[in-house]
Each structure stands twice: as structure tokens, then as C-alpha cells.
Curated annotation (Swiss-Prot):
Name of this protein: Alpha-tubulin N-acetyltransferase 1
Species assigned in the record: Drosophila melanogaster (Fruit fly)
Keyword Disulfide bond: no
Listed GO biological process terms: behavioral response to ethanol; microtubule cytoskeleton organization; neuron development; regulation of microtubule cytoskeleton organization
Marked site positions, Crucial for catalytic activity: Q57
GO cellular-component term (any): microtubule
Primary role: Specifically acetylates 'Lys-40' in alpha-tubulin on the lumenal side of microtubules. Promotes microtubule destabilization and accelerates microtubule dynamics; this activity may be independent of acetylation activity. Acetylates alpha-tubulin with a slow enzymatic rate, due to a catalytic site that is not optimized for acetyl transfer. Enters the microtubule through each end and diffuses quickly throughout the lumen of microtubules.
Phylogenetic classification of the source organism: Eukaryota, Metazoa, Ecdysozoa, Arthropoda, Hexapoda
Ranges annotated as biased composition (Acidic residues): 318-336
Compositionally biased intervals (Polar residues): 233-254, 426-439
Length: 461
């Protein structure tokens, strides 16, 4: 027995008291000052009994403390005391119980979510008073107060002494293995033995075994049936039509994101719209609800015919392309005779109008039987880089072109098609064959039909 330095008789009006999160006995009556005093004394009693229980079970730290009890709202501690022992009385035992939400395995090995499961969290009787019936007295008082049954209780990490106690006094021997530290006995999931309202251990259950939780699966697929009749209900549900399941789902209105509106099946609308003729024009399944049987090949063939008809209605014959008539090739113009006009006096540069000379005449002079181009040649085609500056065109060499300039006749003047053996005359003579006047037009040709090559003396060339 555990004795304290203060008198425990005012706290224990009866041998077994019940303490909740307020740390006051259920039989306590007093003012504010007495409440504070009683709270401090109950804190010391609970902490010392919890430490003795942890030492007896070989735990590193106590499971039961006054601070944990104050922070919880679903735990209760039952204390057993002897007011006649010693001078101030003595506390003999402790029993802590509560409710927990657990995932448990049933006899068939299926996982079940059980809410508000009755749990035995800590049980201790002083070694000097064991095997005297005090533990059975304390445990039975708890069952009567909580309206539980021993078979419906789960035990958290029971010791060998506690297992022997339950086997001796309540006949609990066959254990259902669990993945957690809790121990269940056979009959825990059997609702037939529930004695009273809270004895079944399922606060959210009903007498017919219907188990409803806040899980999304409950909103989507309906409630879960527990107990022995679960297999019978499962077999009967498989034999019923799917409409019963749909009716069960619609009865429980989903909430949250599970209650959002889902889009209808577009393929079903296409099939029903293809089957229904254009009488109603809504494309729904009302036209086909009478027979209920849809011939899929006929529907597919009908859709294919409809698509082909739409394509034929929208199709059109392309107009034949008209091939362009080939343009007649221009006949080659005869080369005009080159008439050399009388040259003006030397060193006279009189510009000739552009209408006097044409590019066709200039190009016919250079080369053998050259024809005028059908389009205007650019300097990318001809390589005549300085054509746009009007200083002359590039020299196009041919077999009839000679460069015989022994002496300086005039600046930038080269005679073309000079007959062989022709001697160069002096600048003082009247050489009409050698002198030419540069025309501003005509593509850089002189009046005699020569190419003005003075751009070769330019530094930028």
C-alpha cells in the first residue's frame, strides 16, 4: 500500500473514486480554495501510482501521469484506497481506461475501423495487496460505471499478470492477433453478446450491426455491416440487382469533394442519340428505354452511314485546273547594222540622249549573234558591279575582242574589234575610229559602240 504525508480521507469519500481531466474526485464538494488543495494532492497521488505501475511492468517511463490526464478528454482513472490503513490512509490500486479509434483485424483477418473502442490503458494493484480480490473489485466497478463488458474491451500492452487476471475472472483466453500493441479477445466483433447500451463497444453502431463512419468510402459505397450477419448480408447484396446498390448510394448524400457533380458519359449520349430518330431531337436515352437492348453493330453501322452522308453533302467537285498556254518564243531579231556616225572633234564630250542608243544594240555588238535578254539582267546575273553607277559595264571577253592600246590615245577609251594590223596613230591626228564620246545613258557605251573602261582606273574598283 502507498501512504502519503497528507490525509487522504477527505478525498476518498468511498473506497473507489473516479477522477477525470479536472483532477478532482467525482465525490468531492468544496470551495475554490479546497479545490486547489485537492487538485494538488490528487496530482501527487496519480503521479506516484503511475510511477509504481511503470516500475512493476518494467517500463522506462510512466504511462499514467496527472499532466496527461489533464490534457485528455476521454480518459478516466479509478483509484482504490483503504482509509483504515495507517494514520492517513493508503491508496491500493489504479485503473486507467479510455476510448480510442483503432484499425483492427477481425476473426477472418479483415481490417476494420472501429471508433470509440473501449480500452484498458493501465492497471495496477500494490504488491502487498494482490491476490486478495481487490483487483476484481476495482475492475468490476469500472465495467459497471462505463457500462462495458470485458470481452468488448481492448487492452493496451497487457502484462502477463493482467492476461492471467482476465483469463481467471472473465474467461478470456482466445486472443485475436493484431498488428498494433492492443489485445482483443474472440467475441469482440460479435454484437450478439452486447448486454446494454454501451456494452457493445461501438459507440457509433446500431443493434442491427450497421457501422457508419465519416470515411469517404461510407459516403460512396454505403454503410458497413459488422458481426456474424455480415456474410449473409454480403451474399444477399450480391444476388440483388445493382439498382439496390445505387439506391443505397443515393440515400447517403456525399459531402465535400465527393459531392461534386460528375460529367455524364459522352459515349452513352452519342450511342443513344444515334439510335433515336430525329423525332424528339434531344438525343437522350428516353427513346431506347423501352427495349433496353442495344445492337451495337447496327448502331455503329448507322453512325458510319450518317457520317458518310454528311461528308457527301459537304463535298464538292474541284474545278479542273487550266494549264497556262505557253508563251510563244520571240523570234530572234536580226542584228542591226552598226553605223558609225562621224565623230566629233577630239576632246569634245557632248552627252548623247538616252533615246539614241538602246541596250539591244549595245549587246548585239559584243559576242557572236547575241540576242537581247527577255528580262532586265541585274548585276547578280551579269557580274557588272558598277552598272548602277553609270560608269560602264564589265568587259565580256569574246573571240572578236582585242585590247590594242600601245599608246595613250584618250583617257579611258579602248577600241574594240580593231582590225588586225591597224597601227596606232598619234593623238594629234584626226582619228575618228579611236575617239569617242562617253554617253551618260546606254549602259556606259561610247558613241562608236565601245565600252568605256575608265572605271578601271578608279580606286574603288
Amino acid at each position: 500500500m502507498v501512504e502519503f504525508r497528507f490525509d487522504i480521507k477527505p478525498l476518498f469519500a468511498q473506497p473507489i473514486i473516479k477522477v477525470t481531466s479536472n483532477l478532482l474526485p467525482n465525490t468531492f464538494r468544496g470551495d475554490r480554495r479546497q479545490c486547489l488543495d485537492a487538485t494538488s494532492k490528487m496530482t501527487e497521488i496519480i503521479d506516484q501510482l503511475g510511477q509504481l505501475s511503470a516500475t512493476s511492468q518494467g517500463l522506462s517511463k510512466p504511462v499514467t501521469t496527472a499532466q496527461r490526464l489533464r490534457m485528455s478528454d476521454n480518459q478516466t482513472i479509478y483509484l482504490l484506497a483503504d482509509n483504515e490503513a495507517g494514520h492517513n490512509g493508503a491508496v491500493l490500486g489504479l485503473l486507467k481506461v479510455g476510448t480510442k479509434n483503432l484499425y483492427l483485424f477481425d476473426e477472418a483477418g479483415k481490417t476494420r475501423m472501429v471508433e470509440q473502442t473501449p480500452s484498458i490503458l493501465d492497471f495496477y494493484v500494490h504488491e502487498s495487496r494482490q491476490r486478495a480480490g481487490l483487483g476484481k473489485r476495482l475492475f468490476q466497478t469500472m465495467l459497471n460505471e462505463e457500462q462495458w463488458t470485458a470481452r468488448k474491451c481492448s487492452v493496451d500492452r497487457p502484462s502477463e499478470k493482467l492476461l492471467s487476471f482476465l483469463s481467471k475472472h472473465y474467461g478470456l483466453k482466445r486472443i485475436i492477433p493484431q498488428a498494433n500493441n492492443f489485445v482483443l479477445y474472440e467475441g469482440f466483433f460479435n454484437d450478439g453478446e452486447s448486454g446494454n447500451g454501451g456494452g457493445n463497444g461501438h459507440a457509433n453502431g446500431t443493434p442491427n450491426g450497421l457501422h457508419i463512419t465519416n470515411s469517404p468510402n461510407t459516403h460512396l459505397f454505403g454503410a458497413t455491416y459488422l458481426g456474424e450477419d455480415s456474410n449473409q448480408r454480403r451474399g444477399s447484396q450480391q444476388q440483388t440487382t445493382p439498382n439496390a446498390r445505387l439506391q443505397q448510394i443515393t440515400q447517403i448524400s456525399p459531402s465535400g469533394r465527393y459531392g461534386a457533380k460528375r460529367p455524364t458519359c459522352s459515349m452513352a449520349e452519342i450511342i443513344h442519340a444515334g439510335n433515336s430518330k430525329g423525332g424528339n431531337g434531344n438525343g437522350s436515352a428516353e427513346a431506347n428505354s423501352g427495349n433496353g437492348n442495344h445492337d451495337i453493330p447496327e448502331i455503329a453501322e448507322q453512325l458510319q452511314r450518317q457520317s458518310l452522308a454528311d461528308l457527301e453533302a459537304n463535298s464538292y467537285e474541284p474545278e479542273p485546273e487550266v494549264e497556262p498556254e505557253p508563251e510563244p518564243e520571240p523570234e530572234p531579231e536580226p542584228e542591226p547594222e552598226v553605223i558609225t556616225p562621224p565623230s566629233p572633234p577630239p576632246k569634245s564630250h557632248t552627252p548623247t540622249p538616252p533615246s539614241v542608243r538602246s541596250p539591244e544594240v549595245a549587246e548585239s555588238i559584243v559576242g557572236d549573234n547575241r540576242r537581247a535578254p527577255a528580262f532586265q539582267l541585274s548585276k547578280q546575273h551579269t557580274g557588272m558591279k558598277n552598272r548602277s553607277f553609270g560608269v560602264g559595264m564589265a568587259v565580256m571577253p569574246s573571240s572578236k575582242m582585242e585590247f590594242d592600246q600601245m599608246e595613250r590615245e584618250d583617257f579611258g577609251v579602248v577600241k574594240i574589234n580593231r582590225p588586225p594590223g591597224h597601227e596606232v596613230t598619234s593623238p594629234g591626228q584626226d582619228n575618228t575610229d579611236a575617239m569617242s564620246t562617253v554617253s551618260s545613258g546606254g549602259g556606259g557605251l561610247t558613241d562608236q559602240g565601245y565600252y568605256d573602261l575608265k572605271f578601271y582606273h578608279n580606286k574603288l574598283w
